[in-house]
């Protein structure tokens, strides 16, 4: 064995220095490693080929492989498409996020006025006004539904806008709106930026009657009796001499008649107060205690004598007293020729029913007098002829069928009047005082 080793050493080349020996050894090692790597790669290729053969042997493997390859291509293509799509989209977003249009400095009233004035007929509907505002101002175009109710409220709540109904021949929806002619100067110098003041339409007062420049006709006051239905209406006949009589003040008011065709009655306008002016002033016809009544005009002396006292009372209306009747009877003989002719008088208006329903039982209490007044009244000559004619006319006009009985009652009253002496002033004063304290007639 030693000899074999020695022969092998002799056949090998001589040894080189240490450095050279180490390099050769390293070179040999690297060569061996490369050979191992190549063998490993070859083995991997063989295994991959075997796997491919196995996959091809399975059904549908080709479609899957095609899909996977197509998916990879689609992803590459989609990424490119997205890049192309995003590029033009960036300027659109910048424009949307840019500055919005500012709100116009006009009020809703100014905007509505602009829309109405630019229309050819100077009137527009609500939809036409909104269309003008949204077309003129971009700010309101972007926020259209929000401000339409504000336009509607301003149209209905401001007096400067007038609603005009739609004509029957013009189909459509909604009324027209126009400007009030009195609101033309609502803005300063035609500038819609500033309004002078709030316009208000002047409405006429509801239920107001035009003022009458003339005073109401002179009519005496109504009678104040126990029953409110017993009212009078004065109807004065034409008087020949109006300057001799004082006019009634305009404060008196007329009253309604009892029936549609009342008779014409005469009221003595100037009461006879006699020698008691204080009682005359207290007996105002407007008070419930005073009872104006009818009196036959037999002479002008009581009228002329009591003219000053009638003007002092402030009313100038008739007041019933026994004294005035007595003075009219006593002065009737001398003053009948001087007094103007008046229409006959009657008491039918004091009844609640028409004159045709008059009964003597209803008329008798009107002429009934108390026993105390009968004892005071003595005998006196007969009354003049005009009084009898007036009594007869009243009896015929009031109750045609009962004229006889009514004439008897009137004659009884005339007999009572005849018993008053002409010169007995003390008894007249006493009787006037009694009638003034009672305030009403005994039978009323």
Curated annotation (Swiss-Prot):
GO cellular component: nucleus
InterPro entries: Fork_head_dom, FOX_domain-containing, TF_fork_head_CS_1, TF_fork_head_CS_2, WH-like_DNA-bd_sf, WH_DNA-bd_sf
Tissues in which the UniProt entry reports expression: Not detected in any adult tissues tested.
Listed Pro residues bias regions: 247-256
Compositional bias ranges of the Basic and acidic residues kind: 47-56
DNA-binding region(s), residue ranges: 102-193
Domain commentary: Contains two potential transactivation domains A and B.
Record-given protein name: Forkhead box protein D4
Organism field: Mus musculus
């Amino acid at each position: 064995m030693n000899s074999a080793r020695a022969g092998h050493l002799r056949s090998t080349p001589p040894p080189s220095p240490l450095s050279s020996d180490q390099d050769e050894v390293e070179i040999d090692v690297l060569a061996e490693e490369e050979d191992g790597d190549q063998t490993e790669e070859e083995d991997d290729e063989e295994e991959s080929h075997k796997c491919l053969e196995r996959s091809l042997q399975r059904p549908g493997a080709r479609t899957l492989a095609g899909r996977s390859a197509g998916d990879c291509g689609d992803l590459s293509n989609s990424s490119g498409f997205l890049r192309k799509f995003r590029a033009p989209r960036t300027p659109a977003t910048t424009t949307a996020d840019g500055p919005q249009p500012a709100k116009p400095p006009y009020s809703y009233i100014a905007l509505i006025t602009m829309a109405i004035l630019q229309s050819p007929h100077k009137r527009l509907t609500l939809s036409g006004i909104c269309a003008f505002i949204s077309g003129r101002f971009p700010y309101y175009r972007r926020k259209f539904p929000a401000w339409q109710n504000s336009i509607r409220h301003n149209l209905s709540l401001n007096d400067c806008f007038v609603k005009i109904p739609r004509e029957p021949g013009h189909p459509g929806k909604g009324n027209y709106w126009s400007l009030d002619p009195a609101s033309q100067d609502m803005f300063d110098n035609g500038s819609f930026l500033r309004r002078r003041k709030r316009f208000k339409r002047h409405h006429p007062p509801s239920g107001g009657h035009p003022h009458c420049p003339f005073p109401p006709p002179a009519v005496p006051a109504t009678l104040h009796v126990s029953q409110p239905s017993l009212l009078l209406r004065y109807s004065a006949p034409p008087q020949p001499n109006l300057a001799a009589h004082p006019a009634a003040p305009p404060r008196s008011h007329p009253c309604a008649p009892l029936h549609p065709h009342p008779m014409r009655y005469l009221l003595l306008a100037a009461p006879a107060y006699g020698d008691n002016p204080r009682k005359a002033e207290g007996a105002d016809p407007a008070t419930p205690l005073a009872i104006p009544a009818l009196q036959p005009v037999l002479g002008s002396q009581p009228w002329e004598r009591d003219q000053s006292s009638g003007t002092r009372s402030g009313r100038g209306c008739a007041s019933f007293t026994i004294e005035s009747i007595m003075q009219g009877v006593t002065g009737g003989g001398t003053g009948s020729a001087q007094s103007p002719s008046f229409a006959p008088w009657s008491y039918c208006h004091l009844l609640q029913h028409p004159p045709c329903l008059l009964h003597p039982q209803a008329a008798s209490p009107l002429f009934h007098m108390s026993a105390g007044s009968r004892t005071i009244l003595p005998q006196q000559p007969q009354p003049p002829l005009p009084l009898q004619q007036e009594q007869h006319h009243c009896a015929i006009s009031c109750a045609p069928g009962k004229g006889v009985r009514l004439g008897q009652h009137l004659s009884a009253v005339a007999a009572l009047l005849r018993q008053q002496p002409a010169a007995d002033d003390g008894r007249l004063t006493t009787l006037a005082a009694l009638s003034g304290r009672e305030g009403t007639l005994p039978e009323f």
